[in-house]
Every structure is written in structure tokens, then in C-alpha cells.
């Protein structure tokens, strides 16, 4: 019994060490909305080691009443997936905006933020693919 416990403990420790993706919490400034938007970025552990490599990137959009942490709560294994699949995940927190530019609320320009502000901010900070060949959005 003691051997099984020790083996299980060592196995769990090894699994934890293998999954070492970086999970960053960022505040991306939006000039169009005049505020900072919270964003969680999950990137493979070695994303900065090969400067010539560009990682595919998936933008994960949360649902109504969610936030930038929603996808980590839904799928806690995202860091391990980022490492295994060599992919970056970006999770913006946009409140209950529906990701659109509002015609009623002047400073609710989330479509503008996503396309003109978030993508360039992510591409400046992380070595991700900068065109549709390596970019996806889902939610």
C-alpha cells in the first residue's frame, strides 16, 4: 500500500512538472474605450526560446456573465493542452458586451477592441501567428 501511495505521488508530481505553460493575467489598454481590459494568456512553457517560431493562437470568448477566467474554470487542463499542442490561448474579459460595438453606449466598442487593439497587443507581446493561417476564435 505504501509503495502504491509513493508511486502515485511521484506520478502526480511528474505530471505537474511536465505541464508548465505560462498563464499571464494582462491589462490590455483600449484607447477606443478609454480603459484597461483584463485578458488571460496561456502560452506554451517554451514560447520564448525559439524566436523564429510563431505559435498558433486561439482566442477563447466567454459567455454571458463570464470573465477572462471562465475558460480556465471550464477547462482547467488548458495549460497542459497549450504545452502538448504547442498553441497559445487568449481569453479576453469583456463583460456582457456580446463582442459588438454598441450604438447606444459610446464607450462600449468591443468589436473594435478585439480586432484593432487586442490582436496587435497580443502579437506584440507573444510570438504568435499573425494571420488567419494560425489564428482561430471560438466561444
Q: Where are the model-predicted features located?
A:
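Sec-dependent N-terminal signal peptides
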Residues: 4-15
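Non-catalytic cap/lid and distal C-terminal segments of serine-dependent acyl enzymes
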Residues: 20-139
Amino acid at each position: 500500500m505504501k509503495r502504491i501511495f509513493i508511486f502515485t505521488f511521484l506520478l502526480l508530481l511528474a505530471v505537474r512538472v511536465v505541464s508548465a505553460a505560462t498563464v499571464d493575467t494582462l491589462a490590455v489598454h483600449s484607447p477606443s474605450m478609454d480603459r484597461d481590459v483584463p485578458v488571460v494568456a496561456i502560452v506554451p512553457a517554451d514560447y520564448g526560446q525559439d524566436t523564429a517560431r510563431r505559435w498558433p493562437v486561439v482566442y477563447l470568448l466567454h459567455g454571458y456573465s463570464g470573465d477572462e477566467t471562465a475558460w480556465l474554470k471550464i477547462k482547467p487542463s488548458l495549460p497542459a493542452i497549450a504545452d502538448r499542442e504547442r498553441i497559445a490561448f487568449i481569453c479576453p474579459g469583456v463583460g456582457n458586451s456580446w463582442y459588438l460595438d454598441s450604438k447606444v453606449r459610446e464607450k462600449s466598442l468591443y468589436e473594435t477592441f478585439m480586432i484593432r487593439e487586442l490582436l496587435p497587443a497580443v502579437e506584440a507581446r507573444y510570438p504568435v501567428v499573425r494571420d488567419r493561417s494560425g489564428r482561430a476564435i471560438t466561444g
